[in-house]
From Swiss-Prot, chain A:
This is Interleukin-1 receptor antagonist protein. SUPFAM superfamilies: Cytokine (SSF50353). Anti-inflammatory antagonist of interleukin-1 family of proinflammatory cytokines such as interleukin-1beta/IL1B and interleukin-1alpha/IL1A. Protects from immune dysregulation and uncontrolled systemic inflammation triggered by IL1 for a range of innate stimulatory agents such as pathogens. GO terms for cellular component: centrosome; cytosol; extracellular space; nucleoplasm; vesicle. One of its GO terms (biological process) is inflammatory response. InterPro entries: IL-1_CS, IL-1_fam, IL-1RA/IL-36, IL1/FGF. Residues 1-25 form the signal peptide. It is found in: Secreted. PANTHER family: INTERLEUKIN-1 FAMILY MEMBER, INTERLEUKIN-1 RECEPTOR ANTAGONIST PROTEIN. Its main location: secreted.
Length: 176, 419
């Protein structure tokens, strides 16, 4: 039972099981957290980190592991999420310019994004699980998947050929 | 940005490029500028000033990663300004020089046989603990010069060093997955027949082991059906020959085994659709969600009033969402978020309150309506009455008990906590 500054009425409620006049005396709680931090690493065990403000995937040892970037995740719909880093202040987006499709980090707050806004669609990724791993397809760029290169320290990017052996599109994606 | 980066790079590596096309886009223009500054462009027309003397060199800071290696093995330090895959396009125009921070002398020194520079990288073979320190790479071309430092720490090859030098890798319980021997590219480059030996706790993993499969020609070890016992320290090693001498290059991996959290379809089990309340009183309506074995972490739970967020609808905070609670009963997971009225007013009787729950599998909603409780209720009369009776009974009981069993103070404690 929580501490309560109106014990009398609490006792009354308790004794008589009066469900309709339940009293809560705890101070108003903080807003429920809609954002969750997830660890992400690819099937080749590469984790994400920033190099010159660019998201790259590679291997971190010893005290370097504190550089690891975790993904901040806000669910949008079943199997669809917004993805960000740095406490949801930088969000992953699929941007098309000309015939080029690329992954971009944008300085927007993940909790300000809305699934109803068309311009926020580029931040939406569709999750699909296979066994223990997850793939991330861009909702704004259908057929384009979040990927890493086989080599370490290369940028995290998007590929439209997920079956190709040169790109890794399967990630372990687990809550902190 | 990266695609642009690579595209532009590939183009620059070629002989011809339309500059006007590149200039059309700002990011690309910025990249050109970057390349000019870096002096790595293959087509830059070099200005004749900037002699590039060491004192004019711009120091661009310390590389964000530290190299942790063990003594007796070869170590390769890469110049952080130049990514290895860019080296071939950069090398015709740029010279790289290395020096150690604590000495002005260049490395390798004249008498030095353990260190040399190859393809811009500093090789140390074999590394000694006293090689630990900060190394500065100076990249210079006709127009520009810049420096960055890299930190190297060479550890004794003992078990005590493992936590400082290991690469953590994670696999999921009861699935199969790979460990990867990292940062070996300098030693396995151009070698299709790379032979990596894998060890667990210093014991060589047998080729015919059903549990572990050393995937030929790759740096990967497949672990079948990962169990908790598979967690721990692994090492992988390749051999490297230099001037007739055989060296071991090893990397250490700490395998952690995680249990994957499963999601289930959440079920809202309370509130009841109609909640009775007296106007002017406080009211808490808990929205309680059953998840079974599913994870609480990915499940969102929130309230709305007439399709408006609670914090927007009641900016004064008369109605507010309480703290989210996550708990388990009999190994089943629940989440609860209360809606708190302080106090209930008539307007609330006509408001459509809704509790929403969402995770990646499902989205559900439940209506809750507040109804005014009858002004006279037996409950309200009985409540103070029963309390008075209870207290009286308690006092009498206490009194009698204290008389009979003096010194048994715990009975009072029991009475206090018993309710």
């Amino acid at each position: 039972m929580e501490t309560c500054r109106c014990p009398l009425s609490y006792l009354i409620s308790f004794l008589l099981f009066l469900s309709h006049s339940e009293t809560a005396c705890r101070p108003l709680g903080k807003r429920p957290c809609r954002m969750q931090a997830f660890r992400i690493w690819d099937v080749n065990q590469k984790t994400f980190y920033l190099r010159n403000n660019q998201l790259v995937a590679g291997y971190l040892q010893g005290s370097n592991t504190k550089l690891e970037e975790k993904l901040d995740v806000v669910p949008v719909e079943p199997h669809a999420v917004f993805l960000g880093i740095h406490g949801g202040k930088l969000c992953l987006a699929c941007v098309k310019s000309g015939d080029e499709t690329r992954l971009q980090l944008e300085a927007v707050n993940i909790t300000d994004l809305s699934k109803n806004k068309d311009q926020d669609k580029r931040f939406t990724f569709i999750l699909s699980d296979s066994g223990p791993t997850t793939s991330f397809e861009s909702a704004a760029c259908p057929g384009w998947f979040l990927c890493t290169a086989l080599e370490a320290d290369r940028p995290v990017s998007l590929t439209n050929r997920p079956e190709e052996a040169m790109m890794v599109t399967k990630f372990y994606f687990q809550k902190e | 940005m990266e695609n642009l980066f690579q595209d532009t790079l590939l183009q620059s590596a070629g002989s011809e490029i339309s500059i006007s096309r590149v200039l059309r886009k700002l990011p690309e223009t910025m990249f050109i500028l970057y390349m000019l500054i870096m002096g790595v462009s293959a087509f830059t027309i070099q200005p004749e000033e900037h002699p590039g003397a060491a004192e004019n060199c711009q120091f661009r800071g310390k590389y964000f990663k530290t190299d942790f290696r063990v003594e007796g093995e070869p170590v390769v330090l890469r110049c952080p300004q130049v990514q290895p895959w860019l080296w071939t396009s950069v090398s015709p125009h740029t010279s790289l020089a290395w020096r150690k921070n604590d000495s002005a002398r260049m490395v390798p020194g004249k008498e030095e046989t353990r260190m040399w520079v190859q393809d811009g990288a500093l090789w140390i073979l074999p590394a000694l603990q006293e090689d630990s320190g900060t190394y500065i790479c100076t990249a210079r071309n006709a127009s520009y010069c810049d420096e960055m430092s890299v930190e190297l720490r060479v550890f004794e090859k003992t078990e005590a060093s493992l936590p400082f030098i290991s690469y953590p890798q994670i696999l999921t319980l009861s699935t199969s997955g790979f460990l990867v021997c990292p940062d070996l590219s300098e030693f396995t480059h151009n070698k299709m027949d790379m032979k990596i030996q894998w060890y667990k706790d210093s014991v060589l993993l047998d080729q015919d082991n059903e549990k572990f499969l050393n995937v030929k020609g790759t740096s990967r070890l497949l672990i079948h059906n990962v169990s908790v016992e598979d967690a721990g320290y692994y090492s992988c090693a390749v051999t490297f020959t230099h001037e007739g001498m055989l060296y071991n290059v090893s990397r250490n991996i700490e395998l952690r085994v995680n249990k994957k959290e499963e999601e289930t379809i959440p079920v809202i089990i309370s509130p009841h659709q109609t909640i009775l309340a007296s106007l002017g009183s406080r009211l808490t309506i808990p929205c309680k969600v059953f998840l079974g074995a599913g994870t609480q972490s990915t499940t969102m739970l929130w309230w709305m009033a007439n399709n408006t967020k609670i914090e927007n609808a009641y900016q004064g905070g008369r109605v507010a969402q309480g703290q989210r609670q996550e708990y388990s009963e009999n190994n089943e997971n629940y989440i609860e978020v209360p809606l708190i009225f302080d106090p209930v007013i008539r307007e609330d009787l006509n408001t459509d309150f809704k509790c929403f729950v969402r995770n990646t599998l499902s989205f559900q909603m439940l209506h809750a309506t507040v109804k005014e409780a009858a002004s006279f209720s037996w409950g309200m009369v009985l409540a103070p009455l029963s309390l008075v009776i209870l207290v009286l009974v308690g006092i009498i009981w206490m009194h009698r008990r204290c008389k009979h069993r003096s010194g048994k103070a715990y009975s009072w404690t029991m009475f206090k906590t018993g309710h």
